Amino acid sequence: MNISLKRVAFPALICSAFLLSACGNKNTEHSDEVTPEDKVMQELSSEAIRNFDKTPNDQHDILLLVDYDNRYTQVSDEMEDELIKLSKSGDLTAEFSYTRKKDNLVSASEMLKNLDLKTEQGRYIQGLIAGYWDQQLKLLEQHKDKTLNDKSLSEDKLKGLGGYLHAQDQLENW
């Protein structure tokens, strides 16, 4: 009985080794390929939080940036709700969608630039967010003729989002 077990076990072990090595080679061959999920994760990866010296104006800038974020979020949510409602009713045109989104981005950018930030950290966060809005405006210009439901527009919205998320993390850490 021992001899037959050895005869079966040894070939099974060899076959298993070959199968595992073949699977391992296949994985290493494809590891250079960047999957869509990898692209999303790369875009969303955020820089490390930068440390800034504390200043007497920190609270002032924090309040301004939080207020800005709350006001922008409210206006943006209302605009998105309006576009979704129009899309569902079949009344949404690419031109109207483009105009509303552009107005929203320009307004967000102008509101941000008009903040009277007094600290280096506040201006750093302001710059990160402004860079994101500039990127979104460029993308919007490239996709003028697309509506809310267009898949390529949704994928492009992720571009530059890492900087925006870093700004949010930086503000939250502050």
What kind of region is each of these model predictions?
Residues 45-46, 76-83, 101-112, 140, ...:
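Extended amphipathic alpha-helical scaffold segments
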Residues 40, 61-64, 68, 75, ...:
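Stable alpha-helical elements in mature extracytoplasmic
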